[in-house]
């Protein structure tokens, strides 16, 4: 059975997300998109932009599959000096700020229905401890309760920080009995840390969707699948062997949009590789 072909609008993150970009995504083979909620791209606080996109989705075949929650609260991806949003922030005020911003973005599901919300649980440098584990339980329980009436499933993503390593994500979800929370497997981070096979084996049935892109195991390059050294046949086989094979979301770097003539072919080829 063919997988849904989902393209992340992260590819266009340096541009305002408008209906023309969504139309292009459909022409290039995407059946659905993941909306990347960076405010310079998709301003979830703008009634006008949300209404414009909602109207387009209602009248077109391309659907909104998921949303990537905000990583920064500013409109410059942190370049203004704004720190990353962090649900495990040492200060209570920082945790509240992160939760409020993520909830603001999630509320757009009332107008643009989507299935999953991908969330960064921690920031680089965060350490695994009883304190961060408790903050994680509290944050995800709250997010799950907020998401349920919206029809959204929050997904935590494996990152490069200790609390977001695969084994710790599983511990958080299972000890906390957080059955309403899933995992988005970030293949690039897995390849840079524990290895893709190990990440899939550890996260197993918690994986609901995958962020698919490539690298060489050192930098988070967001290359087209096949342009790095991830073993794609083995990866696809391992994911397909799960009881519920996850959705594959193509998430290439915005730098690759600087070669627009290549985009249609590269996107179609990537979807074919991902199955």
Model regions and ranges:
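N-terminal pre-domain/capping segments
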Residues: 1-104, 110, 148, 178, ...
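Histidine-acidic metal/acid-base catalytic patches
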Residues: 1-6, 15-29, 58-59, 113, ...
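Active-site-proximal loop/turn and secondary-structure-junction residues that shape catalytic pockets
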Residues: 11-13, 37-39, 70-73, 121-125, ...
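Active-site acidic/histidine proton-transfer and metal-coordination neighborhood
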Residues: 19, 74-182, 192
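Residue-level detector of anion-binding/catalytic polar loops
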Residues: 31-32, 63, 115, 153, ...
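Flexible, glycine- and charge-enriched loops at secondary-structure boundaries
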Residues: 43-46, 50, 88-95, 126-133, ...
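Catalytic-core regions built around general acid/base machinery
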Residues: 49-60, 139-146, 199, 234-238
């Amino acid at each position: 059975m063919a997988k849904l072909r989902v393209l992340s609008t992260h590819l266009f993150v340096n541009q305002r997300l408008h209906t023309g970009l969504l139309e292009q995504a459909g022409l290039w083979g995407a059946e659905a998109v993941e909306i990347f909620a960076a405010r310079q791209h998709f301003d979830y606080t703008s009634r006008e932009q949300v209404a414009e996109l909602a109207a387009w989705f209602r009248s077109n075949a391309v659907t909104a599959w998921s949303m990537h929650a905000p990583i920064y609260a500013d409109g410059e991806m942190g370049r203004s000096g704004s720190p990353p949003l962090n649900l495990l922030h040492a200060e209570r005020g920082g945790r509240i700020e992160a939760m409020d911003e993520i909830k603001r973005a999630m509320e757009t599901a009332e107008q643009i229905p989507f299935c999953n919300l991908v969330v960064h649980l921690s920031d680089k440098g965060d350490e695994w401890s009883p304190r961060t584990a408790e903050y994680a339980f509290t944050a995800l329980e709250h997010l799950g309760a907020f998401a349920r009436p919206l029809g959204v499933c929050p997904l935590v993503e494996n990152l490069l920080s200790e609390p977001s390593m695969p084994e710790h994500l599983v511990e958080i979800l299972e000890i906390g009995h957080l059955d309403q929370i899933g995992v988005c497997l970030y293949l690039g981070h897995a390849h840079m840390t524990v290895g893709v096979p190990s990440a899939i084996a550890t996260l197993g049935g918690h994986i609901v969707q995958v962020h698919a892109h490539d690298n060489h195991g050192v930098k988070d390059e967001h290359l087209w699948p096949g342009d790095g050294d991830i073993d794609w046949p083995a990866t696809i086989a391992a994911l397909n062997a799960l009881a519920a094979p996850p959705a594959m979301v193509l998430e290439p770097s915005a730098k690759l949009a600087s070669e627009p003539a290549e985009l249609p072919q590269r996107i179609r080829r990537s979807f074919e590789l991902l199955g």
